[in-house]
């Protein structure tokens, strides 16, 4: 359904005082680029949707200078607090847009259930694949789907987590289609990045828009670290009341180092690099100023390939020799588990609805995006026949790199990707050109629609799957672009989940509380605190090789 021009509130706004809100929403969605998209603030008749009425009322009276002042305040707060991401060794502030994305309580309940269902099914799948492999024996999914996945590690076979949890943290990427239905775009089960921006976006927004938080029942996000710490402690193999937990980071050159540092500080645990740990007699120890200390749980933000030079890449200087054997002996827990990538491979993604039915005996609550699998002969031929209308994605791609948008590609680009698909069909999938939803976004002094996605974060502590209310909304700031990654011009939005009015348990987020709990400034991430000499490029290169899919 083609969206009509926006009358009602918007036209009424245009008829009122020409010096105020008309200039902010007056030209909203006059471009044909977003004509088919589902706009989250306005319906097809231009009526402000219920969850956004308060935000519209706050923003409509603003003029361009007021919007700029607030946007500048957001930017300064990010810089002052050291909220950056690293791209090619350069620290950059992560753009935060001033218009939040809002999700109603009933809608969030549906999403929460769907995410929980998906995580439970993937947990069953990983336990099965590294155990009895019943799903393969029953012929539910092809055996070669697993054996051909580069993230299936035989080193992980036989490593049984003490409390049965392999996916301690999951990031489930969602989009909203032209009908307004949420769909799963991708699963992230290894080291999903971006939760630090969820928390810092909220803190910063509360400082700049305190009146909005006073009039909306926005569910809190600042207790994520406590849920993560509980999950990590619950996973410990020891019976000690206070297991030693550490966060293992590749180092200061990694794009997500800010997040590693923030989470370690909020959980009250040590942030360590591989050189801070060593193994002896299948035990893991941490070097401290008071001597060595045994480690029980490692929340590692290092890719499998770099984790243990005795098992994976022998040239890794980021990991710890002997770590896998210590995990196999049951003396340390690695979070997330080795080999989880066999559950978030983009080709494996297409079989998750089947896994839900097989393991849980339930119908999927969240649909996938329709996907064609190039490794299947008939689907590959369909892809090649329709290549000009599809989006071609490399199975191992991340950060938006390697994606070819058929309708926008040149003949040479289409010919090149067609040949790649023929040469290595296992490495490619294809999806229709999805119409992502849009949210008003500040662009050059006014508000205009821009495409968004959503990454909610789920934490599994062995007793329940808890989903952080909201998640990271990423926005494609370039007009017409569907690539939301920060490395390609994307930004973010604060994501508000509104609490049910009858709920006393879900506490409101007050601006005063946020100001009191602002974090202390981190050390300058551009300062080399690693102890490596500037000419020692190997650690820096390996850290940068692990740029998270979030970026």
Curated annotation (Swiss-Prot):
Superkingdom classification of source: Bacteria
Pfam entry (one): CP_ATPgrasp_1
Segments of skewed composition (Low complexity): 537-551
Residue segments, region Disordered: 1-22, 523-551
InterPro entries named in the record: ATP-dep_Glu-Cys_Ligase-2, CP_ATPgrasp, UCP005522
Bias (Basic and acidic residues) ranges: 12-22
Amino acid composition bias (Polar residues), ranges on this chain: 1-11
Similarity annotation: To Synechocystis PCC 6803 sll0335 and to M.tuberculosis Rv2567.
The protein, known as: Uncharacterized protein Mb2434c
Organism: Mycobacterium bovis (strain ATCC BAA-935 / AF2122/97)
């Amino acid at each position: 359904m083609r969206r009509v021009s926006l009358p009602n509130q918007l036209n009424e706004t245009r008829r009122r005082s020409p010096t105020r809100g008309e200039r902010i929403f007056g030209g909203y969605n006059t471009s044909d680029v977003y004509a088919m998209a589902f706009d989250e603030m306005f319906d097809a008749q231009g009526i402000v949707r219920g969850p956004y009425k308060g935000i519209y009322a706050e923003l409509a009276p603003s003029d361009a200078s007021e919007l700029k002042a607030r946007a500048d305040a957001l930017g300064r707060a990010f810089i002052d607090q050291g909220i950056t991401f690293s791209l090619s060794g350069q620290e950059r502030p992560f753009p935060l847009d001033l218009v939040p994305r809002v999700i109603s309580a009933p809608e969030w309940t549906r999403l929460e259930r769907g995410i929980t269902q998906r995580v439970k099914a993937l947990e069953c799948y990983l336990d099965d694949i590294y155990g009895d492999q019943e799903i393969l024996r029953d012929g539910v999914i092809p055996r070669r789907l697993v054996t051909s996945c580069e993230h299936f590690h035989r080193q992980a076979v036989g490593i049984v987590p003490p409390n049965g949890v392999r996916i301690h943290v999951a990031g489930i990427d969602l989009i909203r289609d032209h009908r307004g239905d949420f769909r799963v775009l991708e699963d992230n089960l290894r080291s999903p990045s971006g939760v630090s921006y969820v928390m810092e976006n909220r803190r910063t927004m509360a400082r700049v828009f305190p009146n909005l938080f006073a009039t909306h029942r926005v569910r809190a996000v600042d207790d994520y670290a406590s849920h993560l710490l509980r999950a990590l402690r619950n996973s410990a193999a020891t019976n000690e009341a206070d297991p030693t937990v550490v966060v293992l980071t590749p180092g200061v050159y990694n794009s997500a180092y800010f997040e590693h540092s923030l989470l370690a500080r909020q959980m009250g645990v040590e942030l360590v690099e591989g050189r801070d740990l060593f193994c002896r007699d299948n035990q893991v120890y941490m070097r401290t100023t008071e001597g060595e200390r045994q480690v029980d749980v490692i929340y590692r933000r290092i890719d499998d390939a770099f984790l243990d030079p005795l098992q994976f890449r022998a040239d890794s200087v980021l990991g710890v020799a002997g770590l896998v054997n210590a995990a196999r002996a049951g003396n340390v827990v690695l979070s997330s588990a080795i080999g989880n990538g066999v559950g978030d491979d983009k080709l494996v993604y297409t079989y998750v609805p089947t896994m839900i039915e097989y393991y849980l005996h339930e119908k999927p609550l969240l649909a996938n995006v329709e996907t064609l699998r190039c490794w299947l002969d008939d689907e590959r031929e369909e892809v090649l026949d329709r290549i000009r209308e599809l989006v071609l994605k490399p199975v191992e791609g991340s950060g938006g790199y390697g994606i070819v948008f058929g309708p926008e590609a040149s003949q040479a680009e289409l010919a090149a990707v067609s040949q790649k698909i023929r040469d290595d069909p296992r490495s490619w999938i294809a999806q229709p050109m999805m119409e992502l939803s849009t949210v008003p976004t500040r662009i050059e002094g006014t508000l205009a629609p821009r495409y968004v996605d959503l990454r909610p974060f789920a934490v599994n502590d062995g007793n329940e799957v808890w989903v952080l209310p909201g998640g990271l909304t990423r926005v494609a700031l370039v007009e017409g672009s569907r690539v939301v990654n920060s490395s390609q011009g994307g930004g973010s939005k604060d994501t508000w989940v509104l609490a049910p009015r009858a709920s006393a348990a879900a506490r409101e987020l007050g601006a005063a509380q946020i100001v009191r709990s602002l974090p202390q400034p981190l050390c300058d991430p551009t300062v080399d605190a690693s102890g490596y000499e500037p000419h020692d490029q190997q650690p820096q290169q390996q850290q940068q090789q692990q740029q998270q899919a979030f970026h």
